[in-house]
Each structure stands twice: as structure tokens, then as C-alpha cells.
């Protein structure tokens, strides 16, 4: 569970700063630069550890699926953050853990106990409450929020992609599994970038924007490393649920740096998250 919480710290920081950077240089440039840096850094880690990458060839199917779903998830997630509203996008995105848990139970044969399942459900509900303002949500339900379809797509993509990242980590070790997934994912971004080359060329990022996007990639990589380490030997379902608290980090940064004030339902959400994590720790 500790690794899942560390993953949440990295992903929550990347989420907050990714939203800020995405509105300056565009969501696609943000994700391409951030994940390009992550792939380079992951390669440096493999070179440093001297782990063999030959076993990757036996898992090309899982690697391809991880790349497709993860690349789709990142692109749609940053697009959802760019379009907003965050009050809708964030709680929907937090449900990715439920997708991954179902896959872990179905295909890995995991059988979390009643206490773990209860703790996971309470945690996810708490995250959804913490990451939104119910008053704004009710006020904005008269029409389809522009970011909602993108948020749903990203939740499914992250759930499936997270499952396959865990699968790769278990079979290849966290270093090679993490490296293979980052590089394969980058190939997916290259395809998207080529398809959108005209819009990318019309909005070239400045040096400051590139540096900020690299920072987003570094934070995201911290999350990926922690998640990979946790799922290599622990229950994938538990690590997934623990990592799903990442919106709390983004909310905390919004309070600290943007002066936002939490609303009552967010306090309730924090309490539920704490309760859910305690139940997971006792499971």
C-alpha cells in the first residue's frame, strides 16, 4: 500500500502541474514532452542497473496493449483537464482503480478479502468527493460537460493500462517492465503526434513551457516507478486503490498555491479516504 500512496504523490503532482502547463502550451505538447522525458529517464535507469531487456520479446502482446491504453489515457486525460470542468473530470478519473481491480480479480485470480474490498470502495468514494465541489457539479449538470467524455475514456485507459503495467512488472521486474511500458507508450504518442502535426506546428512551446512539461514527466515517472515496485510483489488491486488517491494531492496543491478553499463535501471525502486506507492497512 505504501508504494501505491507514493505513486499517488507523483501522479497527483503531475496532475496539478500538467493541468497548468497544458493550458499554456496545449495538452498534446505537454504529454509528448513529459512522456518523452520519462522514456529517456527510464532508459537511463535500465542502463545503470544493467538489467537484461531480452525477456521483453516474450511479452510483446501485453506491451502493445499497455502502450495503446496508456497512451490513449494520457492524451484524453490532459485533454479532459484542459476542457474541464475539474469538478467533473477529477472524480470520474479517480474511478480508473475500479477498472484495474476488476481486471486483477478476473485475470490474475486475486481475491481481496471483504475488509480490503470495503476499504477500496470507501477510498474511491472518498476520492471522488474530495476532488469535486458538489454545488458546482449540480449547477453544471444541465448539459454535457465538455471534458466528461474525455474523462471517461481516460479512466478506462488508465485502469487497463495500469493493469498491464502491473502485469509487465510481475513478469519482467519493475525496472524492465517500467522501461518497456514507457518506450512502447512513447511510440503511441509518436503516432498521435504525427496525426496532429499541423496543430502541433501551429503552437510550438516556448523554452519555459518545455521545462515545465519535463517537470510534469519527472513527477509522473516517480508515480510509475512506485506503482511498478508495489505491483511486482504485492496485490495489484490494493496498490491500484491506494494510488487512486492522487486527486487529493492535486486538491492540496490547489489549496496551497492557488488559494482555493475546500468545500464541506471535500472534508467528508478526506475523512472517507482516511477510513478506507485504514481498512486497507488492516486487511
Task: Name every feature range the model reports, one short phrase each.
Residues 1-11, 54-70, 111-125, 173-187, ...:
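Structural signature of hydrophobic alpha-helical transmembrane segments
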Residues 1-5, 98-156, 265, 270-283:
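Juxtamembrane helix-loop boundary signature in multi-pass membrane transporters
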Residues 42-52, 100-116, 156-172, 218-236, ...:
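Hydrophobic alpha-helical transmembrane segments in multi-pass integral membrane proteins
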Residues 1-10, 17-18, 23-28, 33-64, ...:
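Membrane-interface interhelical linkers
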Residues 30-31, 89, 177, 239:
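Juxtamembrane helix-start motifs in multi-pass secondary transporters
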Residues 2, 6, 33-37, 61-68, ...:
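Hydrophobic residues within alpha-helical transmembrane segments
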Residues 10, 14, 41, 69-76, ...:
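Membrane-embedded alpha-helical core segments of multi-pass
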Residues 37-42, 92-106, 184-188, 223-226, ...:
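Alpha-helical transmembrane segments of compact multi-pass small-molecule transporters, enriched
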Amino acid at each position: 500500500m505504501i508504494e501505491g500512496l507514493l505513486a499517488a504523490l507523483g501522479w497527483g503532482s503531475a496532475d496539478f502541474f500538467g493541468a497548468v502547463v497544458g493550458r499554456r502550451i496545449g495538452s498534446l505538447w505537454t504529454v509528448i514532452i513529459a512522456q518523452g522525458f520519462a522514456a529517456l529517464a527510464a532508459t537511463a535507469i535500465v542502463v545503470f542497473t544493467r538489467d537484461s531487456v531480452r525477456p521483453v520479446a516474450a511479452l510483446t502482446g501485453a506491451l502493445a496493449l499497455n502502450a495503446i491504453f496508456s497512451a490513449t489515457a494520457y492524451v484524453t486525460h490532459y485533454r479532459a483537464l484542459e476542457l474541464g470542468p475539474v469538478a467533473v473530470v477529477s472524480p470520474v478519473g479517480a474511478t480508473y482503480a475500479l477498472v484495474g481491480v476488476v481486471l486483477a480479480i478476473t485475470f490474475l485470480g486475486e481475491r481481496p478479502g471483504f475488509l480490503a474490498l470495503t476499504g477500496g470502495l470507501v477510498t474511491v468514494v472518498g476520492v471522488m468527493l474530495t476532488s469535486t465541489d458538489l454545488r458546482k457539479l449540480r449547477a453544471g449538470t444541465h448539459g454535457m460537460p465538455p471534458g466528461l467524455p474525455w474523462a471517461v475514456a481516460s479512466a478506462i485507459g488508465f485502469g487497463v493500462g495500469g493493469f498491464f503495467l502491473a502485469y509487465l512488472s510481475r513478469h519482467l521486474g519493475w525496472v524492465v517492465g517500467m522501461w518497456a511500458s514507457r518506450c512502447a507508450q512513447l511510440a503511441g504518442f509518436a503516432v498521435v503526434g504525427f496525426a496532429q502535426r499541423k496543430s502541433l506546428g501551429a503552437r510550438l512551446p516556448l523554452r519555459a513551457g518545455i521545462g515545465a512539461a519535463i517537470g510534469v514527466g519527472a513527477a509522473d515517472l516517480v508515480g510509475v516507478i512506485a506503482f511498478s515496485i508495489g505491483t511486482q510483489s504485492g496485490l495489484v488491486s490494493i496498490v491500484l486503490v491506494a494510488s487512486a488517491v492522487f486527486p487529493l494531492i492535486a486538491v492540496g496543491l490547489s489549496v496551497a498555491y492557488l488559494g482555493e478553499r475546500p468545500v464541506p463535501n471535500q472534508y467528508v471525502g478526506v475523512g472517507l479516504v482516511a477510513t478506507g486506507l485504514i481498512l486497507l492497512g488492516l486487511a
